[in-house]
Amino acid sequence: MFQATTIIAVRKGQQTAIAGDGQVTLGQNTIMKQNATKIRRLYEGKVIAGFAGAVADAFTLFAKFEEKLKQAGGNLSKAAVEIAREWRSDRILRRLEALLIVADAEKIFIVSGSGELIEPDDGIAAIGSGGAYALAAARALNAFSELNAREIAVESLKIASGICVYTNEQISVEVIEK
């Protein structure tokens, strides 16, 4: 659905990490930027979020989500439900072309433009053009290594960047510890 990036979230032990690559692609064939940051800290640093899709749309969604987070007193689940509900029902928001991954120390959610809200069973979620590759790599690394959440997120993005032409190895990471 949305190309030009990969975002992965991993929760393992006492650590939750979201990582994203830095590539910004114009159309199907032009790399415009190599070191963009697609991960942000929200709500006094207690929540981390990453986006895939149109940058302006993602910033609009970040602002809306942070507003919902403040209204919910930092309750990630409640804010995620509210932004998904608003996204689905608002005619302007429905046109936004972006996906979000949001996480705190306890939960991870994917919020989609169609108003879907998905909480992964295994504490690992990925979005973007390289999302399936990063997700598979992260699940394998989680099951068969002693790496922590941050290390799994970074290594899975490196693997995805070797497969997906819209993903690079200029990785930014944010981590929350319990």
From Swiss-Prot:
Q: Where does Na(+) bind?
A: 161, 164, 167
Q: What is its EC number?
A: 3.4.25.2
CDD domains in the record: protease_HslV
Known regulation of its activity is: Allosterically activated by HslU binding.
Q: Which keywords does this Swiss-Prot/TrEMBL entry list? A: Allosteric enzyme, Cytoplasm, Hydrolase, Metal-binding, Protease, Sodium, Threonine protease
Family as reported in the entry's similarity comment: Belongs to the peptidase T1B family. HslV subfamily.
Q: How does it assemble?
A: A double ring-shaped homohexamer of HslV is capped on each side by a ring-shaped HslU homohexamer. The assembly of the HslU/HslV complex is dependent on binding of ATP.
Q: What is this protein called?
A: ATP-dependent protease subunit HslV
